[in-house]
Amino acid sequence: MKLVIQPLLKSGVNIMEQKHNGIIFTAIPDKSNEYYRPFYEDLIYFNEYLNENKSFTDQLVSLSVEEQDFHTSFFEYDDIWLRDVAPVVTNHLVKFKYQPNYLPKDHWRYLDQQFNKWLKKNDFEYVKSPLILDGGNLIWNKKDTVIVTERIFDDNDDWTEEEIIEQLEWDLDVSRVIIIPAEEGDVLAHADGMVKFIDEHTMFISDFLGDHEFRYNVQEVIQEQMPEAKFIVVPSSYTEKGQYDQEIASAKGLYINMLETCDAIYVPKFGLPKDREVLRYIQQHTEKQAIQIHVGEISTMGGAINCLTWYCPDHLLPSKMKRLNNQNEDFSVRKIFDWF
């Protein structure tokens, strides 16, 4: 018992009085969904594992039509990739148009409409942008800079490049928008598979599977607008073995796709020999707690921990969710399920 209590006392954490700093949202599709059916048990395990291993200051809520052993928001959202459809978080929330060219029109329209209904139902306040942008294609340094890939130009080809950048600056309230090249052949072309800010000027950057020329090119593009930028190369252990979707490359072994909250960085765990080494490496470069979350089989569908989640800090949550967020962990799961 002493071994458990002493570290908590030293860090000043009182479990009974712990206030959460934000909510991590996930989504669980219906069991009948043919595309996700082979991964249903993996998705439940992912949520259970995340719930059991998350930071004391984080809460987990999953959009689901079934009760689970973790907190749920009763809502039908028949997909798992929340990051791309959800509002982008800067100093406020910004909801971009969700119209990915890698999905059929009826599919993305349904997902966008459903998620908008959920946002409205729960009284989220956000700015609407006229631009098309997946949430996974925007990285913010928590101050004045965002990074997106050049995919945004293709998705908004009725705008000039200058107009797009000006609109992003206005919507996001930033002074610097850095456009980086997308990886060749990457259907998604998301920045969250390439870079990750860990402070105002320092970022993790993928090793791009040993493609040094491309990595140097990305770094040069960033430093042209951000001369003070520093880079920490995150190793990968990519394997296409078991890739599920012929059109979308597996993300297994791509550790750069991390989720950051106020007090923690959640690192993908793939069941690969390099998992532990990468976790130690990440922990060496952040003062936040690095927590590894298993996404092994799920990642073969083309995404990892950041793609699967949407984190909203407490100050941007609607009031009724703040009430949930400040409840103790022993608050009734059934009560929470009924709230939303």
Where are these regions (language model features)?
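Histidine/cysteine-enriched polar flanking segments
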Residues: M1-F340
